[in-house]
Swiss-Prot record:
PANTHER family (UniProt xref): GLUCOSE-6-PHOSPHATE ISOMERASE
Annotated InterPro entries: G6P_Isomerase (IPR001672), Phosphoglucose_isomerase_CS (IPR018189), SIS_dom_sf (IPR046348), SIS_PGI_1 (IPR035476), SIS_PGI_2 (IPR035482)
Pathway listed: Carbohydrate biosynthesis; gluconeogenesis; Carbohydrate degradation; glycolysis; D-glyceraldehyde 3-phosphate and glycerone phosphate from D-glucose: step 2/4
Organism this protein belongs to: Acholeplasma laidlawii (strain PG-8A)
Gene3D superfamilies reported in the protein's UniProt record: Glucose-6-phosphate isomerase like protein, domain 1
Family according to the record: Belongs to the GPI family.
Name this protein carries in UniProt: Glucose-6-phosphate isomerase
Keywords: Cytoplasm, Gluconeogenesis, Glycolysis, Isomerase
Localisation: Cytoplasm
Active site: 279, 300, 413
Location, primary (coarse class): cytoplasm
Length: 423
């Protein structure tokens, strides 16, 4: 469960949030009946209930077969990478050596990164999970070509085939064909599930299982979020209330939304969130510009601009109620003048920083939406994923755009291919 507080956003709105209830009711029916724009990509809608249990069992068995590996290299970009990365960072213990280690590749074209990754893997016992619906997306295809050669040279072609798992289309595409030809273990990206909505499919579940994340709890969180989203009432449906509030803030002249966190482990969740909303809404000259910031760190860089810059910003704060306990010690000399908070929990100081910042930003004309979760665990990760997915669908439909395509992404690819001389 989560808490949603919009009281520090409502005062900036020109329209009462509840005045959109009839429109929300209509759009809720459009979503549930799968009759709106992009309706052939609504497979994620029921995924918490209809996920492939047999496929998940195969993932568990695969993990058991490779229980002694040092690392799993996940190759993917965009939705084929960000969800797994977000969950891994959300749930891992800082500085704890993870076995197997989760390594990502194919999410950029850095020769420096790939060269040193290959060198690093020379001494690692590893497996590969390549994720791509088509198999021809440039960044992961380049990385896979290099890593496929590396793992075959390291273990031999026959053994390498047992160590490469393909998450791809169920019936077509170059990666599908390669997986068939080579005999790789295959997992499915369904046609009706777009990449940024695929976290709760094999795209995210396979990496999560391999690093020991409790995916059953994650799915339970998503199921609860699903059930909480069945009633369209804005007095009950927090995801829709969030969608309406951000829509009306946009209508009131706020063009930029920052997702704010006070826990570093949430930084990559924000990266997933930015893709979710940026690709879903940013089309036809519409959509909020989505940014993220990690406080208090970014208060010493972006804080000035947020506090005193162009008044086109609002903040959605992702707040965590329970964190680790660690007290500030008393020091006799008190040269740093911190004894006034000696004995206090650092989490308490962090909370006061949050409250003080919120007050300052509101006074400075920056609306605040606050989403509070009890703690950072698999359940709450799953809940938040579905919460934001369904909120995103509602938000995009309020804008009258298709939430599930991304035509603008092709522009850079066409230019790059032309410059590279692709025929």
């Amino acid at each position: 469960m989560i808490k949603l507080d919009i009281k520090d956003a409502k005062k900036f709105l020109k329209t009462n949030v509840f005045s959109l209830q009839d429109q929300v009711n209509e759009l809720h029916d459009v979503i549930q009946n799968k009759s709106g724009l992009g309706n052939d990509f609504l497979g994620w809608l029921d995924l918490p209930l209809t996920y492939d249990k047999e496929e998940l069992d195969r993932i568990y068995k695969l993990k058991e077969q490779h229980k002694n590996v040092d690392a799993i290299v996940v190759i993917g970009i965009g939705g084929s990478y960000l969800g797994a990365k977000a969950g891994y960072e959300f749930l891992k213990t800082p500085f704890k050596k993870q076995k197997p280690e989760l390594i990502f590749a194919g999410h950029h074209l850095s020769a420096n990164y790939l060269k040193h990754l290959l060198k690093y893997l020379n001494k690692k016992n590893y497996v590969i999970n390549v994720i791509s619906k088509s198999g021809t997306t440039t960044e992961p295809a380049v990385a896979f070509r290099l890593l496929k050669a590396h793992i075959e040279n390291k273990y031999g072609v026959k053994e390498a085939r047992k160590r490469i798992f393909a998450t791809t289309d169920k019936a077509r595409g170059s990666l599908y064909q390669l997986a068939i030809n080579e005999g790789y273990e295959r997992f499915v990206i369904e046609d009706n599930v777009g990449g940024r909505f695929s976290v709760l499919s094999a795209v995210g579940l396979l990496p999560f299982v391999f690093v020991g994340i409790d995916v059953e709890k994650m799915i339970k969180g998503a199921q609860d979020a699903y059930h909480d989203a069945q009633d369209p009432s804005l007095k009950k449906n927090k995801a829709y209330l969030y969608a309406v509030t951000r829509f009306l803030l946009n209508q009131s002249g706020k063009d930029v939304e920052y997702l704010i966190n006070y826990e570093p482990r949430l930084a990559f969740f924000a990266e997933w969130w930015k893709q979710l909303f940026g690709e879903s809404e940013g089309k036809g000259g519409k959509g909020l510009l989505v940014h993220s910031a990690s406080f208090t760190t970014d208060l010493h860089s972006l804080g000035q601009q947020i506090q005193d810059g162009n008044r086109i910003i609002f903040e959605t704060v992702l707040n965590v109620k329970k964190t680790d306990k660690l007290s500030i010690p008393f020091v006799e000399e008190d040269l740093d003048k911190l004894n006034y908070i000696a004995g206090k929990e650092i989490s308490y100081v962090n909370e006061q920083a949050f409250l003080g910042t919120k007050e300052a930003h509101i006074d400075g004309g920056v609306p605040n939406i606050v989403i509070t979760i009890d703690k950072m665990d698999a359940y709450h990760f799953g809940y938040l994923v579905y919460f934001f997915e369904i909120a995103c669908a509602m938000s995009a439909y309020l804008l009258e755009v298709n939430p599930f395509d991304q035509p603008g992404v092709e522009a850079y690819k066409k230019n790059m291919f032309r410059l590279l001389g692709k025929k």
